[in-house]
Each structure stands twice: as C-alpha cells, then as structure tokens.
Amino acid sequence: MRIIEGGLDDPRVVALLDIHVTRARGETQRGSAHALDVTELKGADVTFWSAWEGEEVVGVGALRRLTAEHGEIKSMHTAEAARGRGVASALLARIMETARASGMTRISLETGSWPYFLPARAFYARHGFIECGPFGSYRPDPNSVFMTRELGLP
C-alpha cells in the first residue's frame, strides 16, 4: 500500500469521499453531520491523503490545523473491500507523524454517537484516543462523540 498526499482531483478518490459523506450524513441527524466535502478538504488549513493498492484507492484521511499545537482528523474512510487490512491504521500513522512534525502536540476528532459509528470509536480508542469535550468550533451535541490524544512519542 502506498499513501500519497493529495488525490482530490482523482475521480476514484472523489467517489470514495462521496460514499463517506453520504453515509456519515445519512447516519446522523440533520445539523449534526460534520463531514467535509471535497471543496472544504482543499482548504489551506487541511492536508489530505489517499491510500492506494495498485490503481485502486482503498482509503482517505485528512488533518485540519486548528491551532499551531492542535489538529483535527477529518474524512477518515476505508473502502468497504479493503477493511481489516490495516488501511486506517496506516493513514492514522501518517496523519499523526505529520502532525508531530509540524509542531502539533494534540490531535482530536469528532465522530457520531450512533451505532453506525461504533467501529470508528473503537478504532480510535485502540490507538490511544480518549473521549473529551467539544473542541474548536464544536458545541455539545448528543449526536457527537469527541475524542483526543496527546502526540507524545509514537
């Protein structure tokens, strides 16, 4: 598997992001979905990666800089056929490595509180994330779970 920075102009990446956004918004109450679309992922404060096996995109993920010391994981998604093969772990490792290298000391995320999002919450917990309160521009929301992790040594 290779992970490259970028890919937002590739229709295969856009198709996988469309699946991610559609599912995330479909499983969340109106007003509580925070998935970024392609235009937002192209923002100056966002670094985006795509994971590939051969010519097939198998995962995506992004890091949004909130402050000099704090980043947010966005748009993590693994293609259905590639689940269980370490794609998400590899993307998360790249995101955390980049965050550390840029001086961030904390990385956080927002995911849903509904059963559909349970695998995501379990994944992040396995990687050292703990639940926390809202951060950045988020507000308390019963449909959201906020998680964070200090970026000490890998």
Tell me what each language-model feature is.
Residues V46, P142-F146:
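Short hydrophobic/aromatic beta-strand or adjacent loop that forms the aromatic wall/cage
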Residues A68-H70, R106, S144:
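A generic structural signal for beta-strand entry/edge sites
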Residues F129:
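Glycine-rich phosphate-binding loops of nucleotide-dependent enzymes
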Residues A99-G112:
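Conserved GNAT acetyl-CoA-binding A-motif
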